[in-house]
Curated annotation (Swiss-Prot):
<dbReference type="InterPro" id="IPR005679">
    <property type="entry name" value="Ribosomal_uS12_bac"/>
</dbReference>
<dbReference type="InterPro" id="IPR006032">
    <property type="entry name" value="Ribosomal_uS12"/>
</dbReference>
<dbReference type="GO" id="GO:0019843">
    <property type="term" value="F:rRNA binding"/>
</dbReference>
<dbReference type="GO" id="GO:0003735">
    <property type="term" value="F:structural constituent of ribosome"/>
</dbReference>
<dbReference type="GO" id="GO:0015935">
    <property type="term" value="C:small ribosomal subunit"/>
</dbReference>
<dbReference type="GO" id="GO:0009507">
    <property type="term" value="C:chloroplast"/>
</dbReference>
<protein>
    <recommendedName>
        <fullName>Small ribosomal subunit protein uS12c</fullName>
    </recommendedName>
</protein>
<keyword id="KW-0689">Ribosomal protein</keyword>
<dbReference type="GO" id="GO:0006412">
    <property type="term" value="P:translation"/>
</dbReference>
<comment type="function">
    <text>With S4 and S5 plays an important role in translational accuracy. Located at the interface of the 30S and 50S subunits.</text>
</comment>
<keyword id="KW-0934">Plastid</keyword>
<feature type="region of interest" description="Disordered">
    <location>
        <begin position="9"/>
        <end position="31"/>
    </location>
</feature>
<dbReference type="InterPro" id="IPR012340">
    <property type="entry name" value="NA-bd_OB-fold"/>
</dbReference>
<keyword id="KW-0150">Chloroplast</keyword>
<comment type="subunit">
    <text>Part of the 30S ribosomal subunit.</text>
</comment>
<comment type="similarity">
    <text>Belongs to the universal ribosomal protein uS12 family.</text>
</comment>
<keyword id="KW-0694">RNA-binding</keyword>
Length: 123
């Protein structure tokens, strides 16, 4: 417990909030180029082949980003938009790729939750 004299000399330091997505550098999204597109397995107790991509961002960072939805058209050198948001069962994956922008197409035949997967309203 500091004395009043110590508090006059040095005021209390406010704890700084640490960002969960540092590679975005306080931007809502960042553009990047896929350097590798692959699948990986989630940690226990889940089992699947999750689609992820290694992306080199315009901020200079190279991050691993999750590709949401069923099916995708991504390959090496695809230009993508990356947003924050981790995948709980994939360690080290702290970003999501935005579907329906730049080189990524929206999810085919998606009817519900379309806005999250870049799908236009069906006729």
């Amino acid at each position: 417990m500091p004395t009043i004299q110590q508090l006059i000399r040095n005021k209390r330091q406010a704890a700084e909030n640490k960002t969960k997505s540092p590679a975005l550098q306080r931007s809502p999204q960042r553009r990047g180029v896929c350097t590798r597109v692959y699948t990986t397995t989630p940690k226990k107790p889940n089992s699947a082949l999750r689609k992820v991509a290694r992306v080199r961002l315009t901020s200079g960072f190279e991050v691993t980003a999750y590709i949401p939805g069923i099916g995708h058209n991504l390959q090496e050198h695809s230009v993508v938009l990356v947003r924050g948001g981790r995948v709980k069962d994939l360690p080290g994956v702290r970003y999501h790729i935005v579907r329906g922008t730049l080189d990524v197409v929206g999810v085919k035949d998606r009817r519900k939750g379309r806005s999250k997967y870049g799908v236009k309203r069906p006729k």
